[in-house]
A protein has these predicted regions:
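A C-terminal cap/extension of S-adenosyl-L-methionine-dependent methyltransferases
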Residues: 2-5, 15, 131, 230-294
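Conserved class I S-adenosyl-L-methionine
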Residues: 2-87, 105, 178-204
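Class I SAM-dependent methyltransferase SAM/SAH-binding core
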Residues: 93-139
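A short acidic, Gly/Pro-enriched loop at the edge of an enzyme's catalytic core
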Residues: 138-150
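A short beta-strand submotif of the Rossmann-like class I SAM-dependent methyltransferase core
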Residues: 152-155
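A short glycine-rich, Lys/Arg-flanked "PGG" loop and its adjoining helix->strand segment in the class I
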Residues: 163-178
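Short alpha-helix
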Residues: 203-219, 224-225
Length: 294
């Protein structure tokens, strides 16, 4: 079975399901009608897991490389809507949260943080954080209705069987609990071709309407939806080292650009003009509250 032991090696590897595939044979996935990976069998899921298990950890130099600071984005598009009707986040699940950097804006509002993570290098418990190793099939080893809040910051697109994982997130949330989902809404390039540097072997984004449908099929209500990341501004961030999503101005300007170019959205983008459209979504989901008459 293939493994990804470094960012360089991981970028060169790809899932065996892609061997011999073409744009034509993958057209149902590139068109956004289906989500690639969601129909994989257990052996295919296991291969994907081994390719992705440590890939992000290696891309960020085993956790030593600085990640962009997205605190303002996470607050304005996610946490503030959860905290609008309650004083704290309670018991929180961070799926694929690595070192937990996405919780900086709200750490004092968390009763206890549980992080489910595939990369063993991140698994270091402390007084306020408990780590658990991610299961190959995405199942969560927690009781029903255990968490008040679940946070998934750019992690679901690294997982093949997303339908199952969304159902697990729904299961472990208390009625009335919130689930934050931040994900790319493009293919992230052609999967059957060589991957761009900096991408993990199997990651792919979501067709935005399909992601909505999948969340709703799992049982969630969509409370709020924000499209963001206008690609030219991403190049400003990466090229100049500006934390655009920790800036009130840059975040607002980016969201405005995405609203103005929403008409140009498509999932699979093959030229520069098609890339002038929002490329990420931030969803605030809620598990419906229990019926008082039950």
């Amino acid at each position: 079975m293939k493994t990804a032991n470094s960012a360089h090696e991981g970028a060169a590897l790809r899932h065996s399901r892609l061997e011999g595939q073409t744009a034509e044979s993958l057209k149902d996935y590139y068109s956004g009608r289906k989500l690639y990976g969601d129909d994989f069998n257990l052996n295919e899921i296991r291969e994907w897991y081994q390719l992705e298990e440590n890939a992000c950890y290696e891309v960020y130099d085993q956790g030593r490389k600085r990640m962009p600071n997205n605190d303002h984005l996470h607050w304005c598009c996610g946490y503030r809507h959860v905290l609008a009707d309650r004083p704290g986040l309670g018991k929180v699940l961070g799926l694929g949260s690595g070192n937990g950097e996405e919780f900086r804006p709200v750490r004092k509002r968390i009763e206890h943080l549980y992080i489910v993570e595939s990369a063993a290098g991140y698994l270091k418990n402390d007084a306020t954080t408990t780590y658990a190793k991610a299961q190959v099939d995405g199942s969560l080893t927690f009781p029903d209705s255990f968490f008040d809040t679940a946070v998934n910051i750019a992690v679901l697109h690294h997982i093949p069987n997303v339908t199952h994982v969304l159902s697990e997130l729904f299961r472990v949330l208390k009625p009335g609990g919130y689930c934050l989902v931040k994900e790319p809404i493009t293919t992230l390039g052609a999967w059957h071709q060589s991957r761009k540097a900096g991408l993990c072997p199997c990651e792919r984004g979501f067709p935005r309407s399909l992601l909505d449908e999948m969340a709703q099929r799992a049982g969630f209500e969509i409370v709020r939806k924000t499209y963001y990341e206008f690609p030219p501004l991403r190049h400003v961030r990466d090229g100049l080292g500006i934390d655009t999503y920790n800036s009130i101005f840059w975040t607002a300007f980016d969201i405005l650009c995405c609203k103005l170019t929403d008409w140009n959205y498509r999932y699979h983008r093959v030229n520069w003009f098609q890339k002038l459209a929002p490329s990420y979504v931030f969803l605030v989901l809620r598990k419906p509250a229990a019926n008082k008459n039950d």
